[in-house]
């Protein structure tokens, strides 16, 4: 059987390859003047290589070595690293989030109000920080000029009472970076969606599609949840905002990011199992589109995505696997 991560990472790449073969462009969610906007973007433009080229190689759960010089310690693994076997060049890397629509919070709503939950892990925020730091690699003093007037005032980054009032200011600092360097944002996260018939584990006829988030657009999700601070303790999105600012400030000062120290020490009594989660009620406003309401890949086309009998390696205890296994007719030749 395929392990959970094997399927959850390999299936989305197979979906992207299939969409490329059919000339169907994923939806690119990017930041434009502090709001998210959608564009269509070709898969080969995302990957920076023809995904069907025999020289295109996909390494799952590997470190992305181009960021090694920006970091203290070992670069954390990312879901997929893409390279060109012809010249051994590492081209790109992405986090992958295979998500179901609707989620529990939107399952009883009509199609145009449904959304999918997305859970972001801490290492994704590390890669988000690295992708921004890369912009300033040749001139980190520019980043320091933006951050230092505020960040230099902070004597203890682990103290809730001193950090909490600063979080809206941190949000504004990040938006200042995004405003000035909008053209430098890059794709960072692949989010395939698979649609079911309400709460049933039955695939919708309009079943699959692919969204791609830029690094700046992904940051907007937790910034929007942080810009008006909660009255009580620091929330996960707020902590994520602090993580990002602290890692960028470290880079601006020292030219490297000590991500393990940041994640391990700045906890605010929250577990580090995830950076933050956003329910379908939240994500739908960023993803709202005809493709979210009616994904473009029909369910009978799954047999062209999972090929060579791959369905026999599925694990039915997982939701998407179960939905596919429960519909064996998907792989009949007549469809």
Swiss-Prot record:
GO terms for biological process: DNA restriction-modification system. It catalyses: Endonucleolytic cleavage of DNA to give specific double-stranded fragments with terminal 5'-phosphates. GO terms for molecular function: DNA binding; type II site-specific deoxyribonuclease activity. Its EC number is 3.1.21.4. It is an enzyme of class 3 (hydrolase). Keywords: Endonuclease, Hydrolase, Nuclease, Restriction system. Pfam families: RE_HindVP. This is Type II restriction enzyme HgiGI. It comes from Herpetosiphon aurantiacus. The lineage of its organism: Bacteria, Bacillati, Chloroflexota, Chloroflexia, Herpetosiphonales. The gene is hgiGIR.
């Amino acid at each position: 059987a395929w392990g959970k991560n094997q399927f959850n990472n390999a299936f989305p790449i197979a979906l992207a390859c299939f969409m490329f073969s059919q000339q169907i462009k994923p939806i690119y969610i990017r930041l434009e003047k502090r709001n998210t906007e959608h564009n269509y973007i070709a898969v080969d433009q995302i990957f920076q290589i023809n995904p069907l080229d025999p020289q295109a190689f996909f390494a799952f759960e590997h470190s992305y070595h181009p960021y090694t010089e920006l970091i203290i310690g070992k670069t954390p693994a990312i879901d997929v690293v893409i390279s060109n076997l012809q010249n051994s060049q590492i081209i790109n890397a992405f986090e992958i989030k295979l998500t179901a629509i609707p989620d529990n919070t939107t399952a009883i709503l009509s199609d145009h109000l449904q959304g999918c939950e997305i859970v972001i892990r801490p290492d994704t925020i590390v890669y988000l920080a690295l992708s921004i730091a890369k912009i300033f690699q040749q001139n980190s003093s520019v980043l320091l000029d933006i951050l230092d007037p505020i960040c230099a005032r902070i004597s203890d980054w682990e103290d809730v009472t001193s950090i909490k009032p600063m979080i809206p200011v941190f949000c504004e600092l990040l938006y200042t970076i995004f405003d000035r360097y909008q053209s430098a944002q890059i794709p960072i996260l692949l989010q395939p969606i698979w649609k079911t018939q309400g709460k049933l584990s039955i695939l919708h006829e309009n079943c699959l599609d692919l969204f791609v988030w830029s690094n700046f657009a992904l940051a907007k999700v937790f910034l929007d949840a942080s810009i008006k601070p909660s009255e009580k303790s620091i929330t996960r999105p707020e902590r994520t905002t602090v993580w990002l600012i602290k890692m960028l400030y470290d880079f601006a000062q020292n030219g490297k990011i000590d991500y393990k120290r940041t994640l391990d020490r700045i906890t605010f009594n929250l577990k580090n199992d995830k950076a933050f989660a956003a329910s379908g009620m939240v994500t739908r406003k960023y993803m709202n589109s005809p493709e979210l309401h009616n994904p473009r890949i029909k369910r009978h086309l799954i047999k062209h995505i999972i090929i060579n009998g791959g369905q026999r390696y599925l694990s039915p205890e997982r939701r998407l696997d179960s939905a596919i296994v429960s519909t064996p007719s998907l792989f009949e030749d007549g469809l």
